[in-house]
A protein has these predicted regions:
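A solvent-exposed interaction/effector surface
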Residues: 2-185
Length: 185
């Protein structure tokens, strides 16, 4: 019984490397809206028709060794998700040690991509994400962007930081790239 409890605890307190960023400005403590700077990162991504729901499994296979180097790669946070009317896209951030040496994917349709450094606005929310929550917090973020005079570069993405089996203190964010703010180097 003690072994089972220790195993269960290890799952719930497991720490993952998290994509680094710098908070440049906080806009709303209640809604946890922040302007951030993200340095370049290496990601592995896959896009599929909305009806198909295998993106996470395909990416998990990649980090589990289904890559050209047959190398296991540590899970990181966050997981990026976005969608259009026809497609859904998911991306894993790779550990920083793979910035220049990430193994090539074996799966067709999966791509390695190095992101450019950039400025992003984020809003944080808890619980499990749903279409309704994503729409609600995306609208709150858009309102702040408009009131603060920021222009966006691209569509928002949902970021998830927690495993599906984590039931409390969950962290999700909506993130959208913005044009470089005045006075930022």
């Amino acid at each position: 019984m003690l072994v089972y409890i220790l195993l269960l605890l290890s799952v719930f307190i497991q720490k993952y490397e998290t994509q680094p960023y710098e908070v440049l400005q906080e806009f709303d403590q209640t809604d946890q809206i922040e302007l951030r700077f993200y340095p370049a990162a290496m990601m592995v991504a896959i896009e599929s028709p909305k009806a198909r729901n295998g993106n996470f499994n395909a990416l998990f296979r990649y980090i589990s060794g289904n890559n050209e180097a047959q190398e296991k790669i540590a899970m990181t946070t966050p997981v990026y998700m976005s969608s259009t009317a026809q497609t859904q896209r998911m991306a894993f951030v790779l550990p920083q040690k793979y910035m220049h040496t990430a193994p090539l994917p074996k799966d067709e349709g999966m791509e390695l991509m190095k992101t450019s450094p950039g400025y992003f606005m984020a809003i944080r929310f808890g619980g499990y994400s749903s279409a309704e929550k994503v729409a609600f917090y995306t609208q709150k973020l858009r309102s702040t962007l408009a009131s603060e005079g920021y222009n966006t570069k691209g569509a928002p993405a949902l970021l998830s930081y927690d495993a599906p089996y984590k039931f409390y203190n969950r962290r999700n964010e909506i993130l959208v790239e913005v044009e470089r703010p005045n006075g930022q180097d």
